[in-house]
Amino acid sequence: MHGLGITMNFKNDIFAKLKTFDINKLKTEYHNHPEYGLINIPEFLPQYIVNLCSSELYNLPIDKMKHFTRKGSCMYECNDLSITPYQDYLIHALSSTEFIKWLEELTGVKKLIPDPHLVGAGYMKSYRGDTLQVHTDFNWVEEVALNRAVSIIIYFNRGWLEDWGGSLNFYDSKKKKIYSSIKPDSGNMLVWTYKNLIYHGYPDP
């Protein structure tokens, strides 16, 4: 199957999956968070997309990824779509009008614009002992001259076990209380509304 056909399958199959979710229930959960909108949606992607992206990320050579070491964190990232075709197909699907409108309804944030430059986005990989220190995300995206409004993470972990660690913690504005600890189960999608002082990370290896 040529690239355009796969792209259309990703988009159509994700949109079909969206229709299986109870959007009103998701909205209630999202907006019931104590300080900011946050939700983890299990099995968000069709399984074949999870498998394709998981294999692509798993087999991506480390020398093709950027080493992320800011503020004591350690992880690897790649948003070069020329060498990750399945990531490219997925990004196109998640940038579609259908998905953006669904995301706007979920979050209540209107006039969302996907970032074509993938600033701070793309595949990310952590190895044993790697950490993501507790932090807040940057707000201003210079490349598009817009403020970040919504963040999304989709997990592609193969056979993740809970005792491996790596759950993503979300804290209160004083970094003292953990509101949510999100397990990185494969295929799950995490969404949150960007606001100042949304501290998150997995500081323990």
Identify the role of each PLM range.
Residues 48-51, 77, 124-133, 140-142, ...:
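Short catalytic/ligand-binding loop motif for oxyanion handling, primarily in non-cytosolic enzymes
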Residues 1-7:
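Short, Lys/Arg-enriched N-terminal segments with co-localized hydrophobic residues
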Residues 55-58, 91-148:
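Non-heme Fe(II) oxygenase catalytic core, chiefly the N-lobe of the double-stranded beta-helix
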Residues 40, 113-116, 122, 191-192, ...:
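A structural signal for short, well-ordered beta-strand segments and their strand-loop junctions
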Residues 10, 14-21, 25-107:
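Non-heme Fe(II)/2-oxoglutarate
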Residues 151-153:
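Eukaryotic charged/polar low-complexity linker/IDR segments
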Residues 61-63, 110-113, 158-162:
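Proline-centered turn/helix-capping motifs that create local helix->coil transitions or kinks
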